[in-house]
């Protein structure tokens, strides 16, 4: 398989593997292709810079980062450890098994990078329908509050 050289991997956040990953990047001479952003408050703005979001988690409770990516219109390649509830059914998500090997992941990333843009209106409507909008969240809190008042 021919591997493209015009890529850049952006890692947002910090964790226990950061130093190990940085050492591996240096050992593989990939410093020009990998950017460590650390913890950021402006993730939503960073997402607009990227072509694809890749999540290789073995297990996620919901996959909030995948929801954030889709809200920004960013195509996603997700491991099967990310629950299907994280897919907003916008045609932006593709699931790959972590054990599938290198080639299926590369192919999926390249294909997702070529997806057509989904309009913000469609994205907002889908988030509203699935209950992930501000108004839906506000209504859930109000309903919970009113239930507690009755008790």
Regions found by a protein language model. Give the residues of each.
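Aromatic "clamp/platform" in nucleotide-sugar-dependent glycosyltransferases that forms part
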Residues: 39, 58
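A charged, aromatic-enriched C-terminal amphipathic alpha-helix characteristic of glycosyltransferases
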Residues: 116-151
């Amino acid at each position: 398989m021919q591997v493209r050289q015009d890529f850049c991997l952006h890692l947002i956040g910090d964790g226990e593997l950061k130093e190990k990953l940085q050492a591996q990047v240096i050992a593989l001479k990939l410093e020009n292709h990998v950017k460590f952003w650390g913890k950021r408050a402006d993730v939503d703005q960073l997402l607009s810079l990227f072509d694809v979001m890749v999540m290789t988690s073995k297990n996620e409770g919901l996959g909030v980062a995948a929801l954030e990516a889709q809200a920004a219109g960013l195509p996603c390649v997700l491991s099967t450890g990310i629950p299907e509830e994280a897919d907003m059914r916008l045609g932006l998500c593709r699931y790959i098994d972590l054990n599938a090997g290198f080639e299926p992941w590369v192919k999926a990333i390249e294909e997702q990078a070529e997806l057509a843009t989904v309009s913000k209106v469609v994205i907002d409507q889908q988030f509203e329908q699935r209950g992930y909008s501000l108004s839906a969240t506000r209504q859930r809190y109000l309903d919970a509050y009113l239930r507690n008042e009755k008790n």
